[in-house]
Amino acid sequence: MVEWNAVNIFCSRCENSKLRTVDAGSKKVCDKCKTELFPRVDPVVIMLPIFNEKCLLGRQKIFPPRMYSALAGFLEPGETIEDAVVREVKEEVGLNVNSVEYKFTQPWPFSSQLMIGCFSNVDDDKTNLDEDEIEHAVWLSREDINRIFVGKSPDRIWIPPAMAVAHQLIVCLLYTSPSPRDGL
């Protein structure tokens, strides 16, 4: 927010009026032409592909050793949440999604993102990784996830911390069953 306020000083519509900061810095207003300006928010889908009661976690090259997380990607212009989930799962791990179940959102203010958490039921468990995106992926059962939470994962796998959407999706999966649906 500090950076956004620092770079948005003048009105983009009438170009010669200074903007006034309101609502604790979350909005700017031009007193001359009444234009309101809000910070940009980039929507991101983050999802757990699910097949036969197991979820798929992926590992990017930039992750710390042995860390795995949910898959994620930005929504493209004109795309629905469901379309983005289908596209990202197909692009990153080569799986076909047959249903998407929205779970929750979380603002991620430090990079101006809105994280949209979903479960995605897939047709099978045969991955084809885009190695530019995902270095390795692993299917985990609820029992495997429980072992990770108590520090007894045989591969010493770990997941993002509790504040992260990926962590919350994994916890949600432990305590609920994704609803099977035909199609999207």
Q: What feature does the model see in each segment?
A:
Residues 28-70, 74, 96-99, 120-122:
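N-terminal strand-loop-strand
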Residues 2-46:
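Cys/His-rich short segments
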